[in-house]
């Protein structure tokens, strides 16, 4: 069953402002910070991150986000990457069209028992993820991720 969705004029204007090409803070390389700010207004989150991931080389080949944070414990990330269903889903499935959440793969109890959560995301204060992927070449993906701490899912 399809649930009807209503969109207000305010929401449409907010979405339109995201795709506007009139950004004074265009950095040349990467995305303007104002774009991240607009996305965070449309999809409330604690952090937004845009990065390139090379699963074959176990490397992040570019990255930016708000707030600007370090990469965390990348050894822990790569240790648990292939066992983490939401993290490795694009590589395992080849599906780069779906927008996914942790809750698409695990219950909260299951997620909190994973190595990825315990060793990588919990120390950063995050419980929830929303991920959009684009192809980045063989073994590579470009990811836009939204993170939230404890509380409501996306």
Predicted regions and their residues:
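Regulatory input/activation interfaces that engage signals or partners
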Residues: 4-153
């Amino acid at each position: 069953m399809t649930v009807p969705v209503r969109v207000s004029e305010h929401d449409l204007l907010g979405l339109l402002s995201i795709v506007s090409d009139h950004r004074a803070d265009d950095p040349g390389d990467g995305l303007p910070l104002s774009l991240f700010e607009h996305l965070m207004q449309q999809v409330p989150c604690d952090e937004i991150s845009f990065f390139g991931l090379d699963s074959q080389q176990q490397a992040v080949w570019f990255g930016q986000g708000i707030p600007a944070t370090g990469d965390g414990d990348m050894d822990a990330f790569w240790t648990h990457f292939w066992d983490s269903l939401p993290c490795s889903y694009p590589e395992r499935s080849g599906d780069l069209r779906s927008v996914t959440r942790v809750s698409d793969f695990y219950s909260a109890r299951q997620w909190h028992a994973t190595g990825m959560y315990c060793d990588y995301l919990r120390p950063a204060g995050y419980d929830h993820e929303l991920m959009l992927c684009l192809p980045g070449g063989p073994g590579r993906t470009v990811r836009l991720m939204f993170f939230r701490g404890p509380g409501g899912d996306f």
